[in-house]
A protein has these predicted regions:
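ABC ATPase NBD coupling module
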Residues: 5-23, 41, 173-177
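Hydrophobic anchor residue at the start of the ABC signature
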Residues: 96-97, 124
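ABC ATPase "signature
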Residues: 167-168
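Catalytic Walker B motif of ABC-type/P-loop ATPase nucleotide-binding domains
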Residues: 107-110
Length: 201
């Protein structure tokens, strides 16, 4: 990151600086939060990490309210609650509220919509795209869903057994694939106008 091997990062101050700049959203929201920390604490930690530890309490509440509002949550309904009291979709939105407060340079989004229903999925994706537009962050979106990759990406990298086998713009890679691996990946996407062969299922 910035020309440095992240494995060499040592000390609390360096780690805090790294995690302020690089954050993640993961596919399982239920394992992404400390079950003993209330939502207020989760959001306050983000403000503190951004250097807002000494802000007045009213200002901190204003920032947390703004972050929750960005993801269509009401802070006053979340205060004194624990993350596990929320639905999966709400927890995923809470993770995005964290990112809104932290404003990292890079966001690693690992299958962030795989465990939520289709309606919530579209909402979460739109929130991520709006957040990218508002903050200018780079989002590295990891997914097995080729249609989703096309929807959210400027550039696409196809990997096979841990190695990059093809990369380019979303249009180049998905609409005009060059390698066997990419062609196979795209051909495996079910098409509603084709008869499916279920004999191998």
């Amino acid at each position: 990151f910035h020309g440095r091997d992240i494995a060499t990062i040592r000390g609390k101050a360096e780690r805090c600086e790294y995690y302020r700049r690089v954050q993640g959203i993961f596919q399982d929201p239920f394992s992404s939060f400390n079950v003993f920390s209330k939502i207020d604490t989760v959001l306050l930690d983000c403000i503190n990490m951004r250097g807002g530890r000494h802000l007045p309490r009213d200002k901190k509440i204003e920032l947390m309210t703004e972050a929750c509002s960005f993801v269509n949550l009401k802070f006053e309904e979340l205060t004194n609650k624990y993350p596990f009291e929320l639905s999966g979709g709400q927890m995923q939105r809470l993770m995005i509220a964290r990112i809104f407060l932290l404003k990292p340079k890079v966001l690693l989004a690992d299958e962030p919509t795989s465990m939520i229903d289709a309606c919530s999925r579209a909402t979460i994706l739109d929130m991520l795209m709006n957040l990218r537009k508002e903050t200018g962050m780079t989002i590295i979106f990891i997914t097995h869903d080729i249609g989703l990759a096309y929807y959210v990406s400027d550039s696409v990298y196809i990997m096979e057994q841990g190695k990059i086998v093809e990369y380019g713009s979303a249009d180049e890679v998905i609409l005009n694939p060059k390698t066997y691996n990419t062609k196979r990946l795209i051909s495996d996407v079910p098409k509603i106008y084709e008869v499916w062969d279920l004999s191998t299922v």
